Amino acid sequence: MIATRTLDGRLVRLVPLAPAHAEVDARWNADAEVRHWLHRSEDGPELRTRAAVEKKIREVIADPYELRFVIETREGLPIGDVGLLGLHPHGRAELSIKIGEKSHWSGGYGTDAILCLLGFAFTELALRRVTLIADADNARGIRCYEKCGFRHEGVLRAHRLRYGKPLDMVAMAVLREEFAPPADDGGRR
């Protein structure tokens, strides 16, 4: 699904994903520390070149069940991406987020991006539920999701492999009626 407009948060702007973002995304994907927290941490080099990422971006844009944005600082620096996967006619989708610029980790940018996207998802897309799964050892990410209103729904035991070892994952979700956008957003969401 093509994102058609920019969404504004307190710290970030969500701009529609475009092939022009391929170079920066390939750089993030090539960083082992960034990749460690992604569900594809052991992927081969296929999404680490500009050409491969550009091809993938074109596929994402053409997919009617996926909506992706690049996270930019208010100054226009791309720092990651956020999106909704598996958009379903029953009003649900799965959240995906990556902060690729490590200098922006733990600065509130991911929280702001998620809150901005959730506001859009529940109001303009009329979703009922947004889910996610996170590595059980990703304490920073889980705290962020909790701040955004996600609740724990269960543990997926030995759900994926990371570096050849089974890893538990935490299933979380937020419902439309549970979501409360921040009061200090100045009406930007």
Could you tell me what each predicted segment is?
Residues 76, 108, 138, 164:
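Conserved G/P- and acidic residue-centered "switch" motifs that form tight phosphate/ATP-binding loops
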Residues 72-73, 156, 161:
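Core beta-strand residues in small-molecule sensory/regulatory alpha/beta domains
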Residues 99-102, 132-142, 159-163:
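Conserved beta-strand-loop-alpha-helix junction that forms the acyl-donor binding cleft
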Residues 145, 150, 172:
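Conserved active-site tyrosine of GNAT-family acetyltransferases
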Residues 123-133:
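Conserved GNAT acetyl-CoA-binding A-motif
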